[in-house]
């Protein structure tokens, strides 16, 4: 758990490079997320299974890593403006769509807005680039579960319904996140 938690923390600390006006996403931010989860749980925290606690800790650390954008990732995002994600972004942000149609350029503001709106989707890219510790999988905590939980941070809760998870309550974890 510690290895992936630190990976999430280290990526979260780099968010400030791409979003210089955002709150620092460092240990304090992650501790605050954990504190809120703890407060929301109240006495029910004693009923959590070990795998649920691990999922919550990892989600606290990794839920915003989609906002961590390396220079290479920034260039890739800017050069792929013909994807359905960009088309959807322009559809829901018509002023940006009109500006892009007019200039053919993605401004830094547009790129940041696109990443902010889609950061929950980018979690998969970030977590898939990290070797997953076999010990986590052996304990029933696989990468796809964490990705799904982190992505729920930006999706309706019903995306987790009928998920087939019987070992833990992924819906509860998502609500706490």
State where each predicted segment sits:
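Phosphate/oxyanion-binding active-site loops and adjacent basic polyanion-contact surfaces
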Residues: 22-36, 115-123
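Conserved helix-loop functional segments at active or binding sites
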Residues: 39-45
């Amino acid at each position: 758990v510690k290895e992936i938690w630190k990976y999430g923390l280290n990526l979260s600390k780099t968010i400030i490079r791409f979003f210089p006006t955002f709150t620092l996403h460092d240990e304090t931010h992650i501790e605050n997320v954990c504190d809120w989860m703890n407060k929301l749980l109240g006495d029910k925290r004693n009923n959590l299974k070990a795998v649920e606690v691990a999922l919550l800790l990892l989600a606290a650390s990794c839920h915003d890593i989609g906002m961590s954008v390396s220079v290479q990732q920034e260039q890739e995002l800017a050069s792929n403006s013909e994807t359905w994600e960009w088309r959807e972004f322009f559809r829901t942000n018509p002023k940006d769509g009109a500006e892009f149609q007019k200039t053919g350029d993605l401004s830094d503001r547009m790129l940041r807005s696109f990443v902010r709106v889609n950061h929950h989707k980018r979690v998969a890219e970030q977590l898939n680039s990290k070797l997953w510790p076999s010990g986590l999988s052996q304990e029933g905590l696989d990468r796809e579960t964490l990705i799904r939980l982190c992505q729920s941070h930006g999706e309706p809760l019903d995306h987790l319904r009928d998920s087939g998870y019987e070992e833990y309550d992924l819906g509860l974890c998502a609500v706490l996140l």
